[in-house]
């Protein structure tokens, strides 16, 4: 099912028992986090806090708190169907013309979906029902969560940051956390390789000293939100991909203060600029690693205009030790990554990012091994193929008889098919998430590859063990007798 806006999605969730309204007064300071965390860990519903302490604006959390709700938001019936989204992305990343009528018919659904990718620009929109500017801009009107006791200030977590660089026609949408430091100021925490940071860097090169226009949208429709966290090709706007997911063109409206386009159905829109050279210390904050991060400097976002619906809803989340909402997103988006990797490496059978590993710091890959050294080629490919895996510290490669998603299977392969000296690959001085305080230098560390495959001639001179497998005829005979034996009661 497709959803025209966030409210349509909320209504469908409520109808199916996947949204809980909380009318009791709950404090955005710590209390919402504790309730949301307990609910998410229990696989519970999305939460709509209707009476935040000190505010009149309701707060929506845990929207994507289960993998199935992520799939729903992407217009798919279940998590397994997200493989289709990965197939679309692999085609968009490297499109190939059909080689005949049969292949044309096979690709026709993709071609039809591509027609929904251009945006539809409106002259007016719900997100601009109220317009505040200048002194009237006041972030204190928004019940921004203060998630953890050691957090330095309230934190905007689900803002879709919209930018455009000087050399690209497409707009970039990214989700970067933003620390509140004043009534009209936030700190824009983005890493150097992210689209918004690249746009800002190129802007400063092309327009030195000039202010960089930025818009942050809160509470967009689910396809647009999830498009911003999906690994779309660099040449494609997340708006275009959202249209493909939704099956209808993304409706946008021109921002009040600049030429950037904002989601027409968004609940709240913050418009403003980054002043070159204006930086501020960000953090510490409790993060998806389960620790408080170090303080570092990032650009300051000055808000000149705040537009919103008349009865706006604030969409929020928290991050902490997995499972949290980003970890749940990681579980669902894992299915999107598989077809992308398989197009480049057809020998890959499965690919798994364990949520316990922060959903990106460790990967388990199973392959149909074809030659000596094959596992090392795959691990190097994983690190270099998609930007999303540049911070993956550990890659474990196993044969296709191993279930990548079963730790008992994976550990058995590691302990029976690996020699630590021969089968471990260490690479130093590689990009590492700056939040990873275990690395010796901020932003620079090492990677480890583990070849847990069966070894071929050339990789070992020893006779290799054969796995124990029961005789199939005996298994079938005992299957027929099992209930009669009544061993387990």
Curated annotation (Swiss-Prot):
Topological relation to the membrane, as annotated: Peripheral membrane protein
EC supergroup of this enzyme: lyase
Localization: Cell membrane
Binding site for prenylated FMN: 175-177, 189-191, 194-195
Keywords of the record: Cell membrane, Decarboxylase, Flavoprotein, FMN, Lyase, Manganese, Membrane, Metal-binding, Ubiquinone biosynthesis
Free-text function comment from the UniProt entry: Catalyzes the decarboxylation of 3-octaprenyl-4-hydroxy benzoate to 2-octaprenylphenol, an intermediate step in ubiquinone biosynthesis.
Family stated for the protein in its record: Belongs to the UbiD family.
Record-linked PANTHER family: 3-OCTAPRENYL-4-HYDROXYBENZOATE CARBOXY-LYASE-RELATED, FERULIC ACID DECARBOXYLASE 1
Protein name (Swiss-Prot/TrEMBL): 3-octaprenyl-4-hydroxybenzoate carboxy-lyase
Organism of derivation: Aeromonas hydrophila subsp. hydrophila (strain ATCC 7966 / DSM 30187 / BCRC 13018 / CCUG 14551 / JCM 1027 / KCTC 2358 / NCIMB 9240 / NCTC 8049)
Top-level taxonomy: Bacteria, Pseudomonadati, Pseudomonadota, Gammaproteobacteria, Aeromonadales
């Amino acid at each position: 099912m497709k959803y025209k806006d966030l409210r349509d999605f909320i209504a469908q969730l409520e109808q199916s028992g996947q949204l809980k309204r909380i009318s009791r007064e709950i404090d955005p300071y710590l209390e919402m986090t504790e309730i949301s965390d307990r609910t998410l860990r229990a696989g519970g519903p999305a939460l709509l806090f209707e009476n935040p302490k000190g505010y009149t604006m309701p707060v929506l959390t845990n929207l994507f708190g289960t993998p199935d709700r992520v799939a729903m938001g992407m217009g798919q019936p279940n998590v397994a169907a997200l493989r289709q989204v990965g197939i679309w992305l692999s085609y968009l990343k490297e499109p190939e013309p059909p080689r005949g009528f049969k292949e044309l018919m096979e690709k026709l659904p993709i071609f039809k979906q591509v027609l929904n990718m251009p945006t539809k620009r409106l002259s007016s929109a719900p997100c601009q029902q109220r317009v505040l500017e200048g002194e009237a801009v006041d972030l204190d009107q928004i019940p921004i969560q203060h998630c953890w006791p050691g957090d330095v200030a309230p934190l905007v977590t689900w803002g879709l940051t919209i930018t455009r660089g000087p050399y690209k026609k497409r707009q970039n949408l990214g989700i970067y956390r933003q620390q509140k430091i004043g009534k009209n100021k936030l700190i824009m925490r983005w890493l150097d390789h992210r689209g918004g940071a690249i746009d800002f860097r190129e802007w400063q090169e092309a327009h030195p000293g000039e202010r960089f226009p930025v818009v942050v949208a809160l509470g967009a429709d689910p396809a647009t939100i999830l498009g911003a966290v999906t690994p779309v090709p660099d040449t494609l706007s997340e708006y275009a991909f959202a249209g493909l997911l939704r099956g209808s063109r993304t409706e946008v409206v021109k921002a009040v203060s600049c030429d950037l386009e904002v989601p027409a159905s968004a609940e709240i829109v913050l418009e403003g600029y980054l002043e070159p050279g204006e930086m501020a210390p960000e953090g510490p904050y409790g993060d998806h690693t389960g620790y408080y991060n170090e303080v570092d400097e990032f650009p300051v976002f000055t808000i000149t205009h705040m537009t919103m619906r008349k009865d706006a809803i604030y969409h929020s989340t928290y991050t902490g030790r997995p499972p949290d909402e980003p970890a749940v997103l990681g579980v669902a988006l894992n299915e999107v990554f598989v077809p992308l990797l398989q197009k480049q490496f057809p020998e890959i059978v499965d690919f798994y990012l364990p949520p316990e590993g922060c959903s990106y710091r460790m990967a388990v890959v199973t392959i149909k091994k074809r030659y000596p050294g094959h596992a090392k080629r795959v691990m190097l490919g994983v690190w270099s193929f998609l930007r999303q895996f540049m911070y993956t510290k550990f890659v474990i490669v196993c044969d296709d008889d191993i279930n990548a998603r079963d730790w008992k299977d994976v550990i058995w392969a590691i302990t029976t098919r690996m020699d630590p000296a021969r089968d471990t690959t260490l690479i130093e001085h590689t990009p590492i998430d700056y939040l990873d305080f275990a690395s010796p230098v901020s932003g620079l560390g090492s990677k480890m590859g583990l070849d847990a495959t069966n070894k071929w001639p050339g990789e070992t001179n020893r006779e290799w063990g054969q796995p124990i497998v029961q005789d199939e005829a005996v298994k079938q005979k005992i299957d027929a007798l099992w209930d009669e034996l009544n061993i387990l009661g």
